[in-house]
């Protein structure tokens, strides 16, 4: 008989499933923990958001915590969770050492969401107009912090097989410290597809993504400057509907009804928006992790045109549900072709269904995750004994971070 667990999830932000792929990912993990009847406490230091989930409705205890404050130490000592899931390495830096010191027997899991060091290194290479290489991450300050965080944790959840391989091949991280858990999605059934709007019932192009996320903002500029004018020239009545949370004035300035380039702002329901579009455009020139917009497109029967980075680790050996190209002219040509060619459009829809059902099949990935958690909790001492580097980094982190944090706390008291 398996022991019931008490999970503490420490979030970077309060989860907003309709605002970002990261928010959806957090909800997928919560769903699996709830299926096990585990008690969940969700803690976060961020300001409340009106768009976050209803914790009370889900039966989850919601706690606001503070950075650099010893009140967290008392909180976790009283809570005594058996498992702590930390959202992203920056939050692990803030709270991981406190968990290790005051709740040493709790299993520490890092949900990386994406490899930040990879995304930022690609972003820097793009801005410097040069190809990305592994040297960029090996010399990155963010990589040193992120890899240290992975070592300090008992297990890091990887959403991308590409990033999982990168950690093992480039950083030589033991596979025992990693676990591949992509998006956990329900399979698309035949009765789902029969309810989708047809080719003729759909209209226009769509792109979607949190505007605070630099790869998304860059892709909108790329569409505006290099891709959309080519599409609009061939399809003068087509529109591009651009959805995203947190649009700033600079985003809204791009709104241009005359050319069909429409900034729509936050989507109340991203799936509904995607369901009524004929094509999803995602010309991402840098980034990492899984692209929520492309997942939403495939789950709603919407073909997509994207880049190599956009489709990275998302389709295995399967053919993409649309087209992949890094050339802006070809990108526009493929978008125009797919918008007009019903046969190719239907083939692309079917390939998207195949990807969702084979790569992101919830039941098998969820079972592997829960089994891995049980295996780690049952053998935690032996598991940690094999991770000497992790214990060494944790030792020095507690020694240094502890006093810096206490200094900040005292300084804050005096202000």
Indicate where each model-derived feature is located.
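C-terminal amphipathic helix plus adjacent low-complexity
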Residues: 351-415
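Short hydrophobic beta-strand element within catalytic cores of glycosyltransferases
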Residues: 293-296, 303-307
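A short, active-site helix/loop in glycosyltransferases that binds the activated sugar's phosphate group
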Residues: 94-95, 143-176, 251
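Acceptor-binding helix/loop patch of EC 2.4 sugar-transfer enzymes
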Residues: 16, 105-106, 110-140, 200, ...
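N-terminal subdomain of nucleotide-sugar transferases
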Residues: 1-51
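Acidic donor-binding loop of glycosyltransferase active sites
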Residues: 81-82, 275-289, 302
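Conserved catalytic-core segment of nucleotide-activated headgroup transferases in glycan assembly
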Residues: 169, 173, 178-275
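Conserved acidic donor-binding segment of nucleotide-sugar-dependent glycosyltransferases
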Residues: 321-329, 337-342
